[in-house]
């Protein structure tokens, strides 16, 4: 394999060789997990999206319609993009982020996918390393000492300055 060719964007078919069909790979992974002494769960936005916490589409328009109508619509295409919007005042910025935290962290119960993951790990040694800030691992039953949320938790969001300093 020529690494320079690889790094320049060679189509995957040129360098990926799959010895075993997908189903066999999944079965092998399941066997390895069954035999493991402990499991490290690495989770990012894809897990929460798969669980239903999507940042776009109807979930966004239903929960943020007043923001979409008031500000530049192209900047308000989903919750992620809207988080970077240069709101004219701190009150408007905090109104957005308060709604964002409510919709993604406070309001949702433990989602079935997270409950399923917890059910599989309940009696196993495990540790969770996540970039998710939606508190779903805790809601599903994982213990605080078994979770490292590298980007924090929406439930802990606060202004960097006290009110009397603003």
Language model region names:
Residues 1-165:
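Conserved catalytic core of sirtuin-type NAD+-dependent deacylases
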């Amino acid at each position: 394999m020529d690494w320079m060719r690889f790094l320049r964007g060679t189509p995957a078919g040129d360098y990926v060789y799959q010895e075993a069909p997908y189903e066999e790979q999944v079965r092998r992974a399941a066997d390895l997990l069954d035999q493991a002494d402990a499991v490290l769960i690495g989770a990012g936005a894809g897990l929460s999206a798969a669980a239903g916490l999507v940042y776009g589409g109807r979930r966004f328009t239903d929960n943020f319609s007043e923001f979409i109508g008031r500000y530049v619509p192209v900047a308000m295409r989903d919750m992620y993009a809207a988080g970077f919007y240069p709101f004219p005042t701190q009150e408007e910025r905090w109104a957005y982020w308060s709604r964002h935290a409510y919709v993604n962290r406070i309001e949702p119960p433990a989602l079935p996918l997270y409950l399923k993951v917890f059910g599989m790990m309940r009696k196993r040694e495990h540790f969770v390393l996540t970039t998710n800030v939606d508190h779903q691992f805790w809601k599903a039953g994982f213990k605080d000492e078994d979770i490292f949320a590298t980007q924090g938790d929406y439930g802990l969001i606060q202004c960097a300055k006290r009110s009397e300093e603003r």
